[in-house]
UniProtKB/Swiss-Prot annotation:
HAMAP family tied to this protein: HTH_type_RhaS
Molecular function per GO: DNA-binding transcription factor activity; sequence-specific DNA binding
Native source species: Klebsiella pneumoniae (strain 342)
Residue span, HTH araC/xylS-type domain: 174-272
Matches recorded under Gene3D superfamilies: Homeodomain-like, Jelly Rolls
Name under which the protein is recorded: HTH-type transcriptional activator RhaS
Record InterPro entries: AraC-bd, AraC_XylS_family_regulators, Homeodomain-like_sf, HTH-like, HTH_AraC, HTH_AraC-typ_CS, RhaR_RhaS-like_N, RmlC-like_jellyroll
Known DNA-binding region: 191-212, 239-262
């Protein structure tokens, strides 16, 4: 597994924060690093496999990666993101208590993936741009200023996370997408789901297309297919059982969609024939 080292990203030993844009981020094999990072997705779509679990990410997704986590990107489509790197929650020169603003693991569950709406994403971009504009300056004032901006970023993300009440269509769409990650196997009636999150069906179609480039059904199928591929790789269940478990009522239709999405059949994945590309 590839290991990324802080010495390659932090310009000087005194630096505590670094910015690494990926415009776009292509598929990248599984890796981990000896630093922490916050991944901010600006646009496009892709699959983020985090500690073995696949997540569909798009504009507004925010991912919190710790130094012992492993992750990879695949199936990317114009995925543009910015990585905000920091050495560790307790490795700042002028900040204390940073961990209180970060996701907290509870009973083995680490809420690593958040979403913010487009308005907040613009504010995030502004803060990151200020950090990036400072370049590699390492004098005391520059380090302090960069850490202040990092704290502003954390506070903004925390306040804007899904724990906040959905008060506009962007926030409601984000909550709907998070709900789909947990309920993808259910029979979905889009009119009912849209109403559940106080969205009109027309608004749902328009905003999801803008944020992910996909229609609601295409997005749902992609989530289902990603979950199915994970099970094919990491379980002994039959292809038919996995198809039904992931929300497909017909295993032949599932196999057709699967091959169209990944250029491999479910049997190929089960037998590891795609491993050479991983």
């Amino acid at each position: 597994m590839t290991i990324l080292h802080s010495t390659d990203f932090f310009k000087a030993g005194i630096s505590t924060v670094a910015i690494e844009p990926r415009l776009p981020q292509s598929a990248f094999p599984e890796h981990h690093h000896d630093f922490h990072e916050i991944v901010i997705v600006e646009q496009g779509t892709g699959i983020h496999v985090f500690n073995g679990q696949p997540y569909t990410i798009g504009g507004g997704s925010v991912c919190f990666i710790r130094d012992h986590d492993r992750h990879l990107y695949e199936h990317t489509d114009n995925l543009c993101l910015t990585n905000v790197l920091y050495r560790a929650p307790d490795a700042f020169r002028f900040l204390a208590g940073v961990s209180q603003l970060l996701p907290q693991e509870q009973e083995g569950n680490y809420p690593s993936h958040w979403r913010v709406n487009q308005t907040v994403l613009q504010q995030v971009r502004h803060i990151v741009a200020q950090m990036e504009a400072m370049g590699s300056e390492t004098d005391t004032h520059a380090v302090a200023s960069r850490e202040i901006l990092f704290m502003q970023l954390l506070v903004l993300l925390r306040k804007s996370s899904l724990a906040e009440e959905a008060t506009n269509n962007d926030a409601r769409l984000n909550q709907l997408l998070a709900w789909l990650e947990d309920h993808f196997a259910q029979e979905i009636c889009w009119e009912e789901v849209a109403a559940q999150f106080s969205l009109s069906l027309r608004t749902l179609h328009r905003q999801l297309k803008q944020q992910t480039g996909l229609t609601p059904q295409r997005y749902l199928n992609r989530v289902r297919l990603m979950k199915a591929r994970h099970l094919l790789r990491h379980s002994d269940e039959s292809v038919t059982d996995i198809a039904f478990r992931c929300g497909f009522g017909d295993s032949n239709h599932f196999s057709t969609l699967f091959r169209r999405e990944f250029d491999w059949s479910p049997r190929d994945i089960r037998q590891g024939r795609d491993a050479i590309l991983q």
